[in-house]
Amino acid sequence: MAVRASFENNNELGCFAKLTNAYCLVAIGGSENFYSVFEGELFGTIPVVHASIAGCRIIGRMCVGNRHGLLVPSSTTDQELQHIRNSLPDSVRIQRVEERLSALGNVTTCNDYVALVHPDLDRETEEILADVLKVEVFRQTVADQVLVGSYCVFSNQGGIVHPRTSIEDQDELSSLLQVPLVAGTVNRGSEVIGAGMVVNDWCAFCGLDTTSTELSVIESIFKLNEAQPSTIATNMRDSLIDSLA
């Protein structure tokens, strides 16, 4: 299911929220409408948490995370860190990172298995990313853009990349990520996909300007019409049992 929303009339919804299969962070402030859109879709499946990071409301651009963990910049205050820790499931590891490229959401993007990162990201940050988020890390560009988190969004089901990504690059990225990809836009033609939407394995949220065509592409590539949290959990449990057998 894909849902349209805006934060104080701003359609760059991916700046103000962070969505994974285990939790959802939503920026503090503005109206309760923004929070209630997420709460309405996610209630009973994962916690939806009001948060700020380093005193900023653009939390989606400041952090990177998946169901295993969450990385935040070193400028995150102790109170913010403690609040997020208390609100997230115990299985989610949270860690502060000393990184020059501190807008982690712009320079990294990941699902539960693979991460793409800015070619100049610190080696130490890459190791922490692999350890805390339990992902394989690839230094990559998307359509020659180094801000992979801004121009690419993917879940465990599929992904959308910058509209000017060549077919060869799409194929290369798709084989790295092991998910189908499509070149597309959100918010009526915006190339900055990471800022315009958030997605997990059963739900997507995008800006109010997103057209019905863009919405149908999103629902199709992320397989949102087939997905429900319960079936995903069951599939994950079955595969886990198989791997342990």
Residue ranges and their predicted role:
Residues 1-245:
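The feature marks the mature, well-folded catalytic cores of soluble enzymes
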